[in-house]
Amino acid sequence: VKGLSIFYIFIALLMFGLLNQQHLYLNIIAIILALLVLVGLFKIEQKQNNPFLPTNEFNRSIMLAFITDLFIAMSLIGYNLYIPVYLQEQLGLSPLQSGFVILPLSVAWIILNFNLAKIEANFTRKALYISAFTVLLICSVIILFGMKVPLLIAFSVIFAGLSFGYVYTKNSVIVQEESSPRNMKKMMSFYALTKNLGSSVGSTIMGYM
């Protein structure tokens, strides 16, 4: 009960930090407090026999999965939300046309999922993660300087989709494989929450921009 209560305090502070639109300094303070509460939650749960948050499951690989998923979710909301809006409002494309521009991202994601086992057989996990984030960074730079060329955007999001697809899929597999059967459902729930928080943070950033 204590861990759950602290967790709700963390969520409340985080949501206030993301949603408040009155004073920016209040957002910053709330987010800092949320992070401090989260650290406190980990320390408290480590001392519990039956913890709400299974801290013993957070090994290096799972921590990496949670952190990368948070940032990937923040980035993905920019692709899915900002690019279509920009294409419609700034370039005058119809909703259907802007949808077709961003469609290759989803297609590439699906294709990668069907071929992930073959890819992993030839490369290490570290190499694939570094490649995925490098490709995503390059795609973002290309889109940044080619925002007035829809065909270039459509071409770039193909490779972005491959990056998003690998990181999302592999992170999910890591959490499932490296969590104990007893706590796997809890860990997958926290994993899903992390993705949702990343999307919320990304949406907030887009809103401020």
What is the predicted function of each stretch?
Residues 1-68:
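Hydrophobic transmembrane-helix bundles of small-molecule transporters
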Residues 51-209:
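12-transmembrane solute porter fold
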